[in-house]
Amino acid sequence: MRKQLPVICVAAGIVLLAACTNDGGQQQTTVAPQPAVCNGPTVEISGAEPRYEPLNPTANQDYQRDGKSYKIVQDPSRFSQAGLAAIYDAEPGSNLTASGEMFDPMQLTAAHPTLPIPSYARITNLANGRMIVVRINDRGPYGTDRVISLSRAAADRLNTSNNTKVRIDPIIVAPDGSLSGPGMACTTVAKQTYALPPRPDLSGGMGSASSAPAQPQGDVLPVSNSTLKSDDTTGAPVSSSGFLGAPTTLAPGVLESNEPTPAPQPAPVSAPVAAPATAPATATPVSAPAAAAPVSAPVSAPAAAASGRFVVQVGAVSDQTRAQQYQQRLSQQFSVPGRVIQNGAVWRIQLGPFASKAEASALQQRLQTEAQLQSFIASAQ
């Protein structure tokens, strides 16, 4: 029995050592993998629209940097990761990404050390629950405790800072366009076609300024990212600190105005009703102008719309400098005028004004298709 004891101890030690080795290898390739099984309600998220793209042949090779080896993830369906996110805030066109594209902070992109390029992932802000889809098109970050580097647009959508922990769940796109992977668990991705019905915009045209142009606005507004609304109690400045999805969307056909509609309008209406009851020849002409004056006040907003003054609001931030920078970048990118308007503690970023609502709707389409930006039409003040 004494001679067999060392053999048993050695065997047990080998088993323990093998178990430790297996755990270490698993942590290097997969961090907290989660199956793409939904056990709760399904939510719709927006962001970069996933589409099938062949892998970049030069950006998906294992490599070394600063003495550390990086192995490209071969099976994203078994990958999931959580950690701190960095914010890549370089100027547009100042850097070339690993995919060969010029870096653009206005795009919903991200850099990751080992995920395939190009690929897509669902990024979740673990502090507030916000989720968006980003396109992985670059490598990094290196030499830090960060697990992913987000573009400025993606960071603003998630409302992240340099101390925010996020979760990375890859989305796999098949050649037929079907989506799968950990990033699709309890999630559906909003398609751009849902937000861009061209026929309603064309039919709105130059027709009635009060009813016909309002229909495209109703079609566009439902895609505003409801999942980006924070449940915290810090109030409006927090929800508006992100560049996109920050403004509160309006009901279909309603134009935004900084001035509330005067409430005491129904009171003067009773005066013209009483005036015809007396029916003297001189009293009736006097009461008619009195009735016209109160009616003109609530119609003042449609009158402004009829004059052809519309703007497209793309966001609101709490910092004036950032708001002006975004407005200038968008104005340059889309060759349209723009302005920054203060509204309480936030600064609204608006493009325009435009002479017709059809022109504003056309810009909305370009913002969504070319920059994946959500917006709404408001009346120019």
From Swiss-Prot:
GO terms for cellular component: cell outer membrane; plasma membrane. The gene is rlpA. It comes from Salmonella typhimurium (strain LT2 / SGSC1412 / ATCC 700720). Belongs to the RlpA family. A lipid is attached at C20 (S-diacylglycerol cysteine). It comes from the Bacteria. This is Endolytic peptidoglycan transglycosylase RlpA. Pfam families: DPBB_1, SPOR. One of its GO terms (molecular function) is lytic endotransglycosylase activity. Residues 1-19 form the signal peptide.
